[in-house]
């Protein structure tokens, strides 16, 4: 018979990289065809593009296996586990993850071999929460995750809001002062070494404290794989994650996702349970172009496509409703300008020190280690305080920084710190040029520093928005998802239980360590050597008798003044007794000769008139033995210390009632300068807040934190700091204001959630922090207390008290209240 004529080849389909043959007719598809100008017209699309593309196309479906492709679209790719992530969608007609409805809240949908849901922690560097608010419609994958899963309005970074600092806090649940990575550039006098991101010293385990989540997992029998994370390539505590990658920013995001998916394909015996994934965007673009730019939108879309690729890859493995995924950022991004720089050269004739410049500056001696301890930090702060009518930074000694920052208790934190205004930077001199585009590092209360937090998977509640929280809480959350026991950390375990479908950990209430003693009503001591006098009291016996409450009156006082339970004392061997008055209750400490706390409730209508007769009137509390009482002679006129009141005597409804507060058990030692702030706060601001919130419960008291570690000092430590008076001087005073979130209800008849405002006010001799030594209080007090806002949890750690012990709600709800931080910062327009 006749042979069919050989048809000349016209396409490269199924022919890529074939061996060149001179006998073949038509066009070629071998790798040298371009040199001979003999390629088929579809050679580029069929044979070259697949080596550069991470996705399938109709043309690629069913392709013959090609060497060097990034991913495959051949018929056997599922079996070979090298398909592009969109293979099933493009080549098999399945719907994509993005087009699917949100998963139903059925049981965990895991394929065979996955008894426990893997956890992926995915960080998009510098993804500020505002980006998602403004441009969510341009990021369909992230928006779907937000819609279907759990997300927070924002997640608060720790200070300074830098990359390494926050990534390592997320991994350990520790504040920077606890884990040691206190900035991207650090000097440690004990090691006599400098740390920077680019130097090899960053790999020295001596810098890295705490236990990162990848170790917690491996120590408890799980496997952990990290595709980049600060600290993951350091031999911390003698070991690495099970699998880790050395940082290389040139690796494409798609290659990172593909590798994580390959790890999920490993046989069960080798497969990790915990994964990290990190991409540099939108941070890199934010630095270059600033947070409001067309370029940032492109970077966000690139980040969104990276998440989409991960989710499609998970769906292809039927893991999209099996894996728990946390998508978060380390910090936000702020716009900067070379017109907004504060130069140290404008404050010093000779800038003779070393300065870490930028949005979170620190200053130390340049001659280290020699002058490290003798450097005049106080002098520098003084020289930078109240120098100009308008300064765009405030200088602090680290021990005086707002306690909410937890940024003092580490030798690596230099003593001089500048808190810089939004969009400004503080630098040495005009040589500084890195002032265009965007940066981060500022106060973590600034809106521009807020980060995203989204979570999705069978462990999380669906379609759930939660209030903001701090990133120190994420470590405990990850431990719960992996069913691990966390290492000690700064988070409050259980405070994020409302994110989880079936919380793994149930917090238990704190146990009181010291119960109150009794302080019985007794006769007036004779002779009275207290040095106290009060000429306006004519009927002393009658006035004192008011302090002798019967049991029914005590119960009524407790219902009124302690609506959420009595603060419990978690310090050991604390000797104190409860003192009941009609309008306030206090816990008087025989160790420090002042109340540990005082609690009272004021209403919208509480009168705050100051009775003229009582301005200089004080007497001994007859319930306290003279030896355990403060005396008026402790306060000599030449001392800078004066008696201040915890419960204000002017919150009274009758002339007689004021005398209940004019007693030595209600006084605390205060610097005269501080009483200006304290008195204005109590006579003006607290009544104002009570009007706005339909009443307030107020608990206030002293704090002793001489070693500035953020935890209460022992009595031995306190005693070392008592000089020229037997009364110890507090380092701070706290005020916790609680009201009903539903403002139709007073604090006493509140059935729903509570609202809290708490403050930790540094007790300092002057008001230079506000440059207010001559200004009237209405111009500066409220702004100052707002800088020193804090969580109730911070107050608890600094006092050894436990608040809200009488609340009937589940404990995790109370922990949410205790970890809430009120924020007053106004965004820059």
UniProtKB/Swiss-Prot annotation:
Residues 8-51, 52-96 form the SMB domain. It is an enzyme of class 3 (hydrolase). Gene3D superfamilies: 4.10.410.20, Alkaline Phosphatase, subunit A, Extracellular Endonuclease, subunit A. Expressed by venom gland. A motif (Cell attachment site) lies at residues 36-38. SUPFAM superfamilies: Alkaline phosphatase-like, His-Me finger endonucleases, Somatomedin B domain. It is found in: Secreted. Hydrolyzes ADP with high activity. Shows weak or no activity on 5'-AMP, 5'-GMP, 3'-AMP, ATP, cAMP, and cGMP. Is devoid of monophosphatase and proteinase activities. Inhibits ADP-induced platelet aggregation and is cytotoxic to human keratinocytes. Kinetic parameters indicated a higher affinity for the substrate bis(p-nitrophenyl) phosphate compared to others snake venom PDEs. Is recognized by the crotalid antivenom produced by the Instituto Butantan. This is Venom phosphodiesterase CdcPDE.
